[in-house]
From Swiss-Prot:
Residues 1-21 form the signal peptide. Belongs to the conotoxin A superfamily. Residues 22-46 form a propeptide. Pfam families: Toxin_8. This is Alpha-conotoxin-like Ca1.1.
Amino acid sequence: MGMRMMFTVFLLVVLATTVVSFTSDRASDGRNAAANAFDLIALIARQNCCSIPSCWEKYKCS
């Protein structure tokens, strides 16, 4: 393989690595946002549950 061909392969590998890394970061941001939304919903549900006596006894709200 010539020097020019090796440099081209190197650039393609760097580009592919960058694309994979960028899309992985974007996907993890989406998962984090979904997890944060779920945590918020669970917190609100628990706060509402603590105002109901039968639910309060079941889940031991403090």
